[in-house]
Amino acid sequence: MSPALDHTVSFEKYHGTGNDFVVVDGTEPVPYRGAFAEAHCHRETGVADESGAHDRRGADGVLFLALEDRFHPPRIVMTLVQPDGSFAAMCGNGARCAAAWAAARTDASEFMIDTQSGTKRAVVRGKPGGDDSADITVEMGRPTFEPRDVPLAADRDDKLVAEEVKGLEVTAVNTGVPHAVAFVDNVDAVDLDAVAPAVRHADAFPEGANVTLASRDEDGGFSQRTFERGVEGETRSCGTGAVAIVAAAKRLGLVDGDDLIRVSPPGGDLEITVPDGGSATLRGPVEAEYGGRLAARPEQ
């Protein structure tokens, strides 16, 4: 094998409430980032912990991160490549993992994260390592329901709020990426893999949409399940989806005010605020799992 094909790059594996990512320094030479993500994120043949301490293969995406610590606070340039090789403009849990990765390399506890959907501020409490997790809050920007921002089909000039799309009553909102949010009686009673793809590919969403289900819990929070565009399946957690739930709930009058709302995807609890006049926030734990080296140009 030629030296170019045999080249490997260092990586670390992080997860935020089960939403897991391969993290690679953005300065590492990876010639085809899409192919890299397709190979190493695969749930059956992708990245694995050689120690056996973590038995889940693959990942929900690859975070290519460039740390620019000459700024105060330090900046992180974040590029997320999904398992299908596509690029995502924003990922809430990915941004929280990016902040944890940077915190392990600096003495800073605050970072500015440059994403394709704008710059997000993150605050880190603690540093992940061993059995510890970091508590990280990231500002997510203001959710928008505007048709051009979601985006919705070009011939539509009104918001999509509590309308039926392919069998689900959904509300469309962009929280960095588009979400079709449906409130149901019990998220666990829905066959997500059966109902979500039709909505994800509906004509109403020319760029596709993540499909997020929510049901109200007894304590006033929400249970969550999300079928992610680019992953093309359910993930254990979706930060933009959690924010989308609270934004849609406010739009529909299910919650009001600026209070913190708990949203619980399968991977754990997240805390969300969607203020009337400011940026939404996403808070939750991040853990570092393991690291190693991966082929920079995996065989196709």
Describe each PLM feature range:
Residues P143-F145, A288:
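Active-site/binding-pocket entry motifs
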Residues S133-P143:
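Membrane helix-loop-helix hairpins that form the core translocation module of multi-pass transporters
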Residues M1-S133, V181-Q300:
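A glycine-rich beta-to-alpha transition motif near the start of alpha/beta enzyme domains, typified by
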Residues A88, G141, R148-V150, F183:
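Flexible, glycine/proline-enriched loop segments at strand-loop-helix junctions
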Residues V170, V177-V181:
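Selected transmembrane alpha-helices and immediately adjacent juxtamembrane segments
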Residues V22, T171-V173:
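Residues that recognize and position ribonucleotide moieties
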Residues F11, E169-V170:
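Short beta-strand/turn micro-motifs at beta-sheet edges
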Residues F145-L168:
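Active-site glycine-rich loop that binds ribose-phosphate moieties when present
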